[in-house]
């Protein structure tokens, strides 16, 4: 779930 949040928060990454 943490990874999913990071991707949503950082679409550039």
Swiss-Prot record:
Q: Which GO-annotated molecular functions does the record name?
A: rRNA binding
Please provide the record's keywords in A-Z order: Ribonucleoprotein, Ribosomal protein, RNA-binding, rRNA-binding
Transmembrane helix as a keyword of this entry, yes or no, is no
Could you give one GO CC term from the UniProt record?
ribonucleoprotein complex
Question: Could you tell me what this protein does?
Answer: Protein S19 forms a complex with S13 that binds strongly to the 16S ribosomal RNA.
What is the similarity comment for this entry?
Belongs to the universal ribosomal protein uS19 family.
Q: This chain belongs to which protein, by name? A: Small ribosomal subunit protein uS19
């Amino acid at each position: 779930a943490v990874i999913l949040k990071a991707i949503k928060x950082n679409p550039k990454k």
